[in-house]
Regions:
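Pyridoxal 5′-phosphate
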Residues: 1-173
Length: 173
């Protein structure tokens, strides 16, 4: 139970455990260990990812959907109070957020697209790879909440083309 930041033996043992976990997560999703940041959970990860982009690109436009997890919706609504504009896409008749609906929402000031890979209530999958390709052609960052997908489908950050991705251990432990 040592502090992983401490120099004593218990701390160093804890540090090795954290770094081993970091390597395992990176290998599981095709990332490098330096790209893995641990948070207290999915809500903090979602919040940190979205707010970090918003801070780097003030007053930019964000695209998300009206059916995202509350952690994403709340963060985006908060950012509206700080001067960001947010488009909340509505799903189509099949419950999907389509690549075309995202493309139609893109503006010259769009800085982030924040969408989940698999909806936690409907199970509908979003084509994150195609959305990422569209976004990157326009210099837009992509954040994917993949909490529902992790452990249920093969996730690879390179195949998805995302810049930021959130996962949660409680779905796979």
């Amino acid at each position: 139970y040592g502090n992983a930041s401490s120099l004593h033996s218990a701390g160093q043992k804890a540090r090795r455990g954290v770094e081993n976990a970091r390597e395992q997560v990176a290998a599981a999703i095709g990332a490098t260990r330096k790209e893995i940041v641990f948070t207290s959970g999915a809500t903090e990860a979602d919040n940190q990812a979205i707010r970090s982009v918003a801070q780097m690109r003030p007053n930019g436009h964000i695209i998300t959907s009206s059916i995202e997890h509350a952690a994403v919706l709340s963060t985006c609504k908060y950012l509206e109070t700080l001067g960001h504009s947010v488009t909340f896409l509505k799903p189509d008749e099949r419950g999907e957020i389509t690549v075309q609906s995202v493309a139609d929402a893109v503006r010259s000031d769009t800085v982030l697209i924040a969408l989940m890979r698999i909806n936690n209530e409907t199970g509908i999958k979003t084509d994150i790879a195609s959305i990422s390709q569209l976004a990157h052609e326009k210099g837009i960052l992509v954040f994917c909440d993949a909490v529902q997908a992790f452990g249920f489908e093969n996730l690879n950050v390179n195949d998805l083309g995302v810049d930021l991705l959130s996962l949660s251990a409680h779905k796979v432990y």
